A protein has these predicted regions:
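Short, Lys/Arg-enriched, Trp-marked, Pro/Gly-tolerant hinge/linker segments that flank
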Residues: 1-33, 46-54, 58
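Terminal helix-turn-helix DNA-binding modules in bacterial transcription factors
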Residues: 23, 27, 46-84, 90, ...
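Short hydrophobic/aromatic patch on the recognition helix
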Residues: 40, 44, 88-89, 93
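Short coil turns linking two alpha-helices in DNA-binding domains
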Residues: 36-37, 84-85
Length: 110
């Protein structure tokens, strides 16, 4: 099957959206799609300007924002996205968005 880079990226994005797949490594995803890790990493860099890890983290945090906006608790979000702890999730969220998840929720509802 000859797919364009864009089609492959869409399939990978859909795959990573499935519950339980948010924390897969580049090695695991490349294996799932029958390509080398090096090829996957190059594809992500070319298509997004980010590393696979940066992109996957961004996808997780955008999901987190949506879930927090829908009323899911910080603990539930951290667990759903396979963070090792609430504090690990909070720290990463703050690194990306410059606010904690709790501050984000307060701002969203003010």
């Amino acid at each position: 099957l000859n797919l364009s880079s864009n089609e492959i990226m869409l399939r990978i994005y859909d795959f990573l959206q499935a519950p339980g797949n948010w924390s897969l490594s580049a090695d695991q995803v490349s294996s799932e799609f029958g390509m080398s890790t090096k090829t996957l990493v190059r594809l992500f860099q070319k298509e997004t300007g980010m590393t696979f890890h940066q992109w996957a983290t961004q996808v997780k945090l955008v999901l987190a924002m949506a879930w927090l906006s829908d009323g899911m608790s910080i603990t539930q979000v951290a667990h759903q996205l396979s963070y090792s702890s609430d504090s690990a999730f909070i720290a990463q969220f703050k690194r990306y968005f410059a606010v904690t998840p709790g501050e984000f929720v307060k701002q969203a509802y003010c």
